[in-house]
Amino acid sequence: MAHKKGTGSTRNGRDSRSQRLGVKRYGGQVVKAGNILIRQRGTKVHPGNNVGRGNDDTLFALIDGIVTFEYKTKSRRKVSVYPVAAE
């Protein structure tokens, strides 16, 4: 007879990798063309001036400039990138 109890195995201990969604560059930050501004599912925030939208609704800068968050309408937000004024 066994003198030790057999240890049972657990069926827990797995979880899926999070999707790392959210705002990646905030208002007032300087960005380069191609920088990802927001990773999102659906168009929570819409693309504004000089901002492109990827197949997965990711928003990215089309030009070098400063990020600004604005409202298209009362409830619809957009993000734009405006060029830095040359001094």
Curated annotation (Swiss-Prot):
Region (Disordered): 1-24
Coiled-coil stretches: none
GO CC, any one term: cytosolic large ribosomal subunit
Source organism, top-level taxon: Bacteria
Keyword ATP-binding: no
SUPFAM superfamilies per the UniProt record, alphabetical: Ribosomal L27 protein-like
UniProtKB keywords: Ribonucleoprotein, Ribosomal protein
Gene3D superfamilies listed in its UniProt record: 2.40.50.100
Molecular function GO terms recorded: structural constituent of ribosome
Family matches, as Pfam families: Ribosomal_L27
BP GO annotations: translation
Family: Belongs to the bacterial ribosomal protein bL27 family.
UniProt protein name: Large ribosomal subunit protein bL27
Organism of provenance: Crocosphaera subtropica (strain ATCC 51142 / BH68) (Cyanothece sp. (strain ATCC 51142))
Gene: rpmA
